[in-house]
Amino acid sequence: MMFRDQVGVLAGWFKGWNECEQTVALLSLLKRVSQTQARFLQLCLEHSLADCAELHVLEREANSPGIINQWQQESKDKVISLLLTHLPLLKPGNLDAKVEYMKLLPKILAHSIEHNQHIEESRQLLSYALIHPATSLEDRSALAMWLNHLEDRTSTSFGGQNRGRSDSVDYGQTHYYHQRQNSDDKLNGWQNSRDSGICINASNWQDKSMGCENGHVPLYSSSSVPTTINTIGTSTSTILSGQAHHSPLKRSVSLTPPMNVPNQPLGHGWMSHEDLRARGPQCLPSDHAPLSPQSSVASSGSGGSEHLEDQTTARNTFQEEGSGMKDVPAWLKSLRLHKYAALFSQMTYEEMMALTECQLEAQNVTKGARHKIVISIQKLKERQNLLKSLERDIIEGGSLRIPLQELHQMILTPIKAYSSPSTTPEARRREPQAPRQPSLMGPESQSPDCKDGAAATGATATPSAGASGGLQPHQLSSCDGELAVAPLPEGDLPGQFTRVMGKVCTQLLVSRPDEENISSYLQLIDKCLIHEAFTETQKKRLLSWKQQVQKLFRSFPRKTLLDISGYRQQRNRGFGQSNSLPTAGSVGGGMGRRNPRQYQIPSRNVPSARLGLLGTSGFVSSNQRNTTATPTIMKQGRQNLWFANPGGSNSMPSRTHSSVQRTRSLPVHTSPQNMLMFQQPEFQLPVTEPDINNRLESLCLSMTEHALGDGVDRTSTI
């Protein structure tokens, strides 16, 4: 995974957290940077906030003891909101203001525990206070006691949830205690005594609450956040474990489905304080309608509810090898439907593809979500037809930007490995013998008025159920034997995808080089190589294409191309951006069909020995090249890169230097008989024939396709 992709994943997690979680995570990451990095970040932040007048006003209020003292006359809801916005702005060393905060915090926490309100907001306040450099060791020790009170109160209120939550708190504290022993020397030395106070305090108050309610420390950790955030070298690990519960209304942060892990992080992104005040009693979990957005396990992202405890033995197809469901959580998240991940986690791929609105209605899915899910599944069913359409567009010379963008989007959708129909009867005979959890979409879960429609849908979905045989990595799909000829069976999405990738490779090899398309294509192949739906044979073929495109890219005469004014005018972006995907502007600009005459063939694609097959009359002599390769003629349509540098080292290759080595899949025809065979009248055109380059491209295209379809075990091409 490239750095750009890693940053994107991290940004996705970050957006799913609330402001407090974001602050804790950033603080834990900053502990790992050097002094120079920390100072640079400080300068950047100070520069960006210099003109923020509103922040300056809040900061003055946050450090004014008189203003803070007046908050005691306000309602508890308003005080909580004020504390959340002002406490982080308290300056270290302002003892008077800190004393006022320490007077308010116990009152707010006591009110929250007594009335079982604002539990989440109270946890956030505790988080800020426990990691704030302005609070002393004694302050943190006193505040840490409230965390246990919050836990006890919530455990009593929520009944069966106390086991998982108390375990998770103990786990976070114990894990932090041991982690701290080895992390003091890894903080790069720029933390001061204020920060070290956090760590000392955390160790002290952890000892007071080290006893586990169940008599042991659980051995699992959060599955929704990166490991580094749960094993940080500061007290933020404890804060995360303390915050990680009682939030059944928040969205799931993780791209993976909720698991039986009580130590899950909060998931509500960019909460406003109005939202914090408005939530109140709604945070209580519901025993009904588990799929509604207000109470679903998936939407909360929390593993501490009784729903997950009841499903400890339930199947989770997201984790089953060859199920085709591993990408469903990410797919649902892209559709903003990830709150229903728990529903899909107990379906097979075939059951998901056969879903109807009636079945979803029986599971209490809202009307808008039902409609969106059904439409999205219908789009999944149309993927193979879309691939066929893309294949035709590529063959006809269409722009590669749009197909590559479509392929990038498609590879992120759920794709299951194709199983031939011959294995389906055996799989079906074995299926009743295997123990299986009842499906959520079974007849018993459907409403009476929907059973007939579901039965009809199931009948129509029977052919697609042939893929239930599981992943067969060594099975050969039809496209591997005859890439460009044999039709693929219905449902062979990986095979169809591979075929389109072959067509794209052909176009990249024979068309004018486009670094953006090449980079996008290589990234796409990397995703295919780690995808479970593709067979080993398909992956070998994809790897071969990747190597060829990489070789083509490495042999790219960059200096020569950068010296061509016409090429620079057509490409507004320079080289060195090979890791970038097509941008919105570039994709929008390439919507029209590509004119083959505008994309000439560079010298590396066809060696000079093969060019000789066309006869000397089809090309310009060296003297003619010297007189015709002028910018004016290039702008008039003769922009063939062969004529870009007359007389130079990158000019049209001679017979003594071939830019492409000979391979066994495409022999070089140098005998007189073969030369006569290729010297047909249609190729013996005058030099002034305007479509000579178009004919050359067609010839190279056919030669490359012949090489790509060389055979089952012969993965080499030109």
Curated annotation (Swiss-Prot):
Residues 453-466 have a biased composition (Low complexity). Belongs to the SMAUG family. SUPFAM superfamilies: SAM/Pointed domain (SSF47769). One of its GO terms (biological process) is positive regulation of translation. The modification Phosphoserine is found at S168, S420, S580. The modification Omega-N-methylarginine is found at R573. Residues 278-323, 416-474, 572-601 are annotated as: Disordered. Acts as a translational repressor of SRE-containing messengers. SMART domains: SAM. Keywords: Cell projection, Cytoplasm, Methylation, Phosphoprotein, Repressor, Synapse, Synaptosome, Translation regulation. It holds the Pfam family Vts1. It is found in: Cytoplasm; Cell projection, Dendrite; Synapse, Synaptosome. This is Protein Smaug homolog 1. GO terms for cellular component: cell junction; cytosol; dendrite; fibrillar center; P-body; synapse. It comes from Homo sapiens (Human).
